Amino acid sequence: MAKIAQGAMYRGSVHDFADFDANQDAEALYTAMKGFGSDKESILELITSRSNKQRQEICQSYKSLYGKDLIADLKYELTGKFERLIVNLMRPLAYCDAKEIKDAISGIGTDEKCLIEILASRTNEQIHQLVAAYKDAYERDLESDIIGDTSGHFQKMLVVLLQGTRENDDVVSEDLVQQDVQDLYEAGELKWGTDEAQFIYILGNRSKQHLRLVFDEYLKTTGKPIEASIRGELSGDFEKLMLAVVKCIRSTPEYFAERLFKAMKGLGTRDNTLIRIMVSRSELDMLDIREIFRTKYEKSLYSMIKNDTSGEYKKALLKLCGGDDDAAGQFFPEAAQVAYQMWELSAVSRVELKGTVRAANDFNPDADAKGLRKAMKGIGTDEATIIDIITQRSNVQRQQIRQTFKSHFGRDLMADLKSEISGDLARLILGLMMPPAHYDAKQLKKAMEGAGTDEKALIEILATRTNAEIRAINEAYKEDYHKSLEDALSSDTSGHFKRILISLATGNREEGGENRDQAQEDAQVAAEILEIADTPSGDKTSLETRFMTVLCTRSYPHLRRVFQEFIKKTNYDIEHVIKKEMSGDVKDAFVAIVQSVKNKPLFFADKLYKSMKGAGTDEKTLTRVMVSRSEIDLLNIRREFIEKYDKSPHQAIEGDTSGDFMKALLALCGGED
């Protein structure tokens, strides 16, 4: 069993088996594998119920009793994923890691994700044991093999981590914290090009406690989390490795919770990753991983494994997991405090928003107007030229092109485009040609037209736009449709949902900072309306109105403080509780507001992902997000997308769309991450 620090609580899910008898277990395993077929149920039940130390004793007893190698017999009797899981459990952790790394660097291609996961997350002691195990098992030097299979700064950082010389957590120097912040800042943000050596030295050698202080101070000094600077300054596998190191320094269990979620979400399961983590963390921090998983993803690790795997493989994984946290229906106080700390950090964070479309240099509206006219004249249409010009100009420049087109040719550019292109490409190009407020106004109008209302589009636009954007939309709606937006919303929606939309459509959200006393009162209102407060006060209708007022009119910085106070007061995350306690369009509207306040680029990254996953593509949502965010924060959205879904929007668009529509979307996307 893993060594526990003195006074520390054991957080593994697998314990030493009481009344353990190695000979008896060896006999039971021999019996389970004897004859025709094997008793897989008995094998998994026994092996998942013993600690790693006890399993090593069973291996020894098996050899003494039968003169045979237990692992070799298990490999012979079992197959597939179940065999890989059971065999991994039978190896000492260091040898298990050594085998994973050997597999990662053998053959054609390298499994960089496996190398990153193991070397970024292990302690000094675990690294030393791994190096020794690799030498013992393969009679080769691990460092030499890593050097032979990797290159560049990625290789250098792996070699640094392989030394296992990170300072102990009691090594913290306040003066050095400031110096490291300055060195990292100068090596990245302030330098033309990046001094990767500074990042490697500081992140590869300083103690975890010291680096946590460095990260906090870096955020205060630069207004950016260290992760944002790493994404901006580094690239490729080196960037992924450094981000993994930062995540493990902040919270190793959270890093593994994310890895497990990504291993099981979407089509297909990454079984090697799932097995590696469940085996390696079962006697270290599985309970912490479960807590964070439950809070972060609103489902238990147990339930996700249950739904994503099958057979004996599933049963063995569930035994290692050790319990279903959904059964209790509660969020863990420890995990809630992680969320609280996240809000504490976000309070001082100033993330720079960046679009992917910028004003073109050497802009010539005359040449662009002529280029577009030529592309649409005669037989056939030159879609490539249309896409190239329109996606590479800012919206202000496009309006100048429209005016120049009319002055030169006496023709309406929008009308010509409508007659020459069609379908999804037409919707995208025409959307780009409209001023943003008029585009949003049109999207709102279309959402309320005909039979049925597109509530999701109404929510997406009204919950995410700034006051200035909302006011411009109101003016554009009145100008284009000769009716106020409020009247349109009133006639097309009803009840509490209507009141929320009208409140958002006034564009009267406060724009100041936070008020701590008011935030505590607002958090209490939220706790009462969501029925988790100890002492509810006031009638429900009044509370509903106050809750709506809080979410629809308070400033973003203030709401972040409210959400933080809500966690402190209840040990719940407000978004999770809204999803659990509310329903329908009201729930969707409030969740959208909360998500937008928490992280607007992530909100839109989720929208993009959902528009392209599964059968069929939601082209309307995909187009709306790409058009409306291209000059605001699409670069930030790209980063959130790849962070959460492990693939880039560029890859998703390539895989889910085609033809000229795809080309135009990729041009707006602005690059492959």
Curated annotation (Swiss-Prot):
The modification Phosphoserine is found at S13, S422, S537. Keywords: Acetylation, Annexin, Calcium, Calcium/phospholipid-binding, Cytoplasm, Phosphoprotein, Repeat. It holds the Pfam family Annexin. A pair of annexin repeats may form one binding site for calcium and phospholipid. It is found in: Cytoplasm; Melanosome. GO terms for cellular component: apical plasma membrane; cytoplasm; intercalated disc; late endosome membrane; lysosomal membrane; melanosome; membrane; mitochondrion. GO terms for molecular function: calcium ion binding; calcium-dependent phospholipid binding; calcium-dependent protein binding; cholesterol binding; GTP binding; identical protein binding; ligand-gated monoatomic ion channel activity; lipid binding. Its main location: cytoplasm. This is Annexin A6. The modification N-acetylalanine is found at A2. Annexin repeats lie at residues 20-91, 92-163, 175-247, 251-322, 363-434, 435-506, 521-595, 599-670. Seems to bind one calcium ion with high affinity.
